[in-house]
Amino acid sequence: MRFPLEVYRAIRAAWPEKRPIGVRISATDWIDGGWNLTDSVAFSRELKALGCDYVVASTGGLSREQKITVGPAYQVPFAERIRRETGIVTMAVGLLHEPKLAESVLVEGKADLIAIGRGMMADPRWPWRAAQMLGADMRYPAPYERCHPSLMRRDIFKATREAV
């Protein structure tokens, strides 16, 4: 834990105090006897004491010995426990592809932030789809309305042609 804390101190010293700094950690390496969630809670507590603004709770994935149970929101419990036991702001990751699932993580207080990585790679329009699914009134800026699939059928140039 000493080396990453030294790195954090050096970054904090060089970075403007009023700008946030977060640290992404592997909350467990999924190996018996390896780095675990209890270690991550202690590490996150140290980071908070040094002024860290948030922790992104990811997990390992580098050993053949790891025993990972993968499924929707499978890494959320790590962020939840770190948040509960340290009070630091946490960001949850881990197959939060479905907008309602991602929202529930926030609403239920399991994390303060979420990150969508692979879900955005698979669906670059994820934020728009999520907003629509969750009932937000999303509008394209006028110059970009043509790119919205439901507006492409509409004759947006009709008024221009009639004026000519």
Tell me the role of every PLM-derived stretch:
Residues 1-164:
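Flavin-dependent oxidoreductase catalytic cores
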